Regions:
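Short, glycine-/small- and polar/acidic-enriched structural segments
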Residues: 12-92, 100-101
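Immediate post-signal peptide segment of exported/extracytoplasmic ligand-binding proteins
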Residues: 1-5, 89-94, 247-248
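Pocket-lining segment of extracytoplasmic ligand-binding domains
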Residues: 125-207
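An extracytoplasmic/periplasmic, membrane-proximal ligand-sensing/linker region
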Residues: 147-148, 204-250
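A bilobed periplasmic-binding-protein/Venus flytrap-type ligand-binding module shared by bacterial periplasmic
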Residues: 20, 82-90, 95, 171-185
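Short helix-initiation/N-cap motifs at beta->coil->alpha
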Residues: 31-42, 120-137
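Ligand-binding cleft/hinge of the Venus flytrap
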Residues: 16-28, 106-125, 206
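Short beta-strand->loop
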Residues: 4-10, 94-104, 109
Length: 250
């Protein structure tokens, strides 16, 4: 039997998943690769991967998809690593530069701009280092991932907090998704493996301590910012977001 090809996210928020997979017997059954979120989705869409930890908005592009895990990359409150960095208060923003690494975060910013912030900025896809976006008086940028830590801008808006204030619900950034039905026995093993993060979170933080940006407490980030269980509230938030996102995804 061919190994199941899994594409996982290469950010700090998903390192607990990586550790659990790499320290389990399931490694004999899988071909594991690490990518930025948008590449995880592209691999799943092209058939280069069977399972991916993908930005949830990508499911709108998939003719067939299955959420196969009760774990996700989510946030009940501030997530810290998905932000709108701005030179001006929200009401004055005229241009927003977009990070290409995750289409979910871009879609979330568009939803919030239209329905919550009530602004109509110009949206510009930025191919370079998003932390170096053109800083004019009324510009802003969607910044995601590890580079969002310590983002230096006059105004930094956490998009998970903004979504919570808008809807009263938590937000789901990424889920484990398959592009075809997967053997149930494998899915059960896969989920048991991933759930090992809760019992091993301290050891995982120690394991990756040398990969941590200065000033970042991994354990605090994983326990107080990232929320891994895909709860009923998160599923409700996910469903609502996809309803909004259908109208802003291009």
């Amino acid at each position: 039997m061919s190994p199941i090809r899994i594409s996982a996210i290469s950010y700090l928020n998903s390192l607990p998943f990586a550790w659990c997979l790499e320290h389990s017997a399931i490694m004999d059954k899988i071909d594991l690769s690490y990518d930025i979120p948008s590449q995880c989705a592209d691999k799943l869409l092209s058939g280069e991967a069977d399972i991916g930890l993908i930005p949830i908005v990508e499911t709108l592009r998939m003719p067939e998809h299955y959420i196969i895990s009760d774990l996700c990359i989510g946030a009940d409150k501030a997530v810290r690593t998905v932000v709108l960095a701005s030179e001006t208060p929200l009401a004055n923003i005229s241009t927003i530069y977009l990070d290409s690494h995750s289409r979910t975060s871009v879609a979330l910013a568009r939803v919030l701009a239209q329905h919550f912030w009530k602004i109509e900025p110009e949206w510009i896809h930025f191919s370079g280092d998003i932390t170096k976006y053109p800083r004019s008086g009324n510009s802003a940028a969607v910044v995601i991932g590890d580079k969002a830590f310590g983002m230096q801008s006059p105004y930094v808006y956490d998009l998970a907090v903004e979504w919570r204030e808008f809807t009263g619900l938590p937000f789901v950034f990424a889920c484990w998704v398959a592009n075809q039905p997967i053997d149930k026995e494998f899915i059960n093993r896969f989920n048991r493996t991933l759930n090992g993060l809760f019992d091993n979170i301290n050891a995982i933080a120690e394991h990756y301590s040398d990969q941590t940006p200065a000033g970042v407490d991994l354990l605090d980030y994983w326990t107080n910012n990232i929320s891994y269980p895909l709860t009923a509230d998160k599923r409700e938030g996910l469903k609502l977001f996809l309803q909004y996102a259908t109208h802003v995804v291009h």
